[in-house]
C-alpha cells in the first residue's frame, strides 16, 4: 500500500473565509489521521498564526511555513529545517524596499524563536497587520531605526502588503537579486497585495521534497488556491485546486473540487479517501 501525504494550503483552501478550521473539516482530517493517513499543511503564515488557527487538527507530519522557509514539527515544537537569506542578498533586498520608499517586516530566527523587526508602520495595512499579530498571536515585534543594521545572517523572510502599483517596482528589483526568491500575490481577505522575499532555496516545492525524502512518502496529494501554490503543485503527484482558486492554478490542477466556503478539501478527502479505505 502506498504511503501518501496529503498537504493543503491554508488561506483560501483549507480555511473557511472566516478564516477558520470548520468543525466538519476538523472531524474529517482527524478521522483521516486516526486511521493512519498522513496530513499536514503548507502556508505563507508563520508559526505564530499558523499553529493557533490549526490547533483543532491532529497534524501528524511537520508543516511547511512561510512559503517553504521553515519546516516545523508541531508535535515536538521544533524547527527541522530553515533557509536563511545570505547577508549580501539581505542588504540588496532592503535597498530595493528603501529606493521605492516601501517599508517591510523582517523576520529573524533567534535561538529557535521567530522575531519580527520593523522600522516604522507607515500604512494603515501595516499597522493593522502588526496589531492583529501582537494581540491575537502574541508575536514578538521589535522596532529599530534601520533594518539593515540587524540583517546579520539570521534573517529568513521579508514581507509587506499594499497596493499592486506600489509594490510592483520592489518586486521587479527583487527578482534581479541573486540568492532570493519571492511571492507576489493578491490577499484573499483585504484586496491588498503581498510581497514576500525569502531564500532562493526556500519554496513549497522544496518543502514537500524534504518531507517526501525524510519520511518516505510514495505519493503527495496537494491542495491549493493561489499562485504561491504553483511550486507545491510541481512537487505533487496529484494536484487539486479548490473551486475558488485562481485560474492559473486550476489550469495546472489534475482535479478541481468544491470551494473553501463549502469545506471543499474535507469533502474530497471524505469521499475519495475515507470511503475507499
Residue ranges and their predicted role:
Residues 1-5, 22, 194-277:
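Mg2+-dependent phosphoryl-transfer enzymes with acidic/Ser/Thr/Gly-rich catalytic loops
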Residues 26-34, 98, 175, 209-213, ...:
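Surface-exposed amphipathic alpha-helices with a cationic face
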Residues 57-59, 67, 177-178, 235-236, ...:
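Short, structured coil segments at secondary-structure junctions
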Residues 60-66, 182-183, 239-243, 257-258:
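Short hydrophobic/aromatic-enriched beta-strand-loop microsegments
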Residues 107-221, 227:
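Conserved acidic, metal-coordinating active-site core of Asp-based
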Residues 3-19, 93, 233:
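Asp-based phosphoryl-transfer active-site loop
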Residues 9, 43, 225:
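Active-site glycine-centered loops adjacent to acidic/histidine catalytic or metal-binding residues
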Amino acid at each position: 500500500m502506498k504511503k501518501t501525504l496529503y498537504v493543503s494550503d491554508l488561506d483560501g483552501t483549507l480555511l473557511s473565509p472566516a478564516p477558520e478550521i470548520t468543525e466538519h473539516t476538523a472531524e474529517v482530517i482527524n478521522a483521516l489521521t486516526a486511521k493512519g493517513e498522513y496530513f499536514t499543511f503548507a502556508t505563507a503564515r508563520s508559526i505564530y498564526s499558523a499553529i493557533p488557527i490549526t490547533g483543532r487538527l491532529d497534524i501528524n507530519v511537520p508543516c511547511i511555513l512561510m512559503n517553504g522557509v521553515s519546516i516545523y514539527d508541531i508535535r515536538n515544537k521544533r524547527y527541522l529545517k530553515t533557509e536563511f537569506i545570505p547577508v549580501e542578498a539581505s542588504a540588496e533586498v532592503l535597498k530595493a524596499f528603501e529606493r521605492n520608499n516601501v517599508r517591510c517586516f523582517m523576520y529573524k530566527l533567534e535561538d529557535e524563536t521567530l522575531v519580527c523587526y520593523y522600522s516604522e508602520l507607515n500604512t494603515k495595512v501595516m499597522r493593522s497587520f502588526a496589531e492583529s499579530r501582537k494581540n491575537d498571536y502574541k508575536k514578538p515585534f521589535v522596532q529599530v531605526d534601520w533594518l539593515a543594521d540587524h540583517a546579520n545572517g539570521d534573517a529568513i523572510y521579508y514581507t509587506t502588503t499594499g497596493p499592486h502599483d506600489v509594490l510592483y517596482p520592489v518586486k521587479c528589483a527583487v527578482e534581479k537579486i541573486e540568492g532570493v526568491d519571492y511571492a507576489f500575490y493578491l490577499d484573499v481577505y483585504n484586496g491588498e497585495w503581498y510581497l514576500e522575499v525569502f531564500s532562493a532555496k526556500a519554496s513549497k516545492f522544496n518543502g514537500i521534497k524534504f518531507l517526501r525524502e525524510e519520511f518516505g512518502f510514495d505519493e503527495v496529494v496537494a491542495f491549493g488556491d493561489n499562485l504561491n501554490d504553483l511550486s507545491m503543485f510541481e512537487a505533487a503527484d496529484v494536484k487539486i485546486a479548490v473551486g475558488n482558486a485562481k485560474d492559473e492554478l486550476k489550469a495546472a490542477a489534475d482535479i478541481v473540487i468544491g470551494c473553501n466556503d463549502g469545506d471543499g478539501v474535507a469533502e474530497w478527502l471524505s469521499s475519495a479517501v475515507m470511503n475507499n479505505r
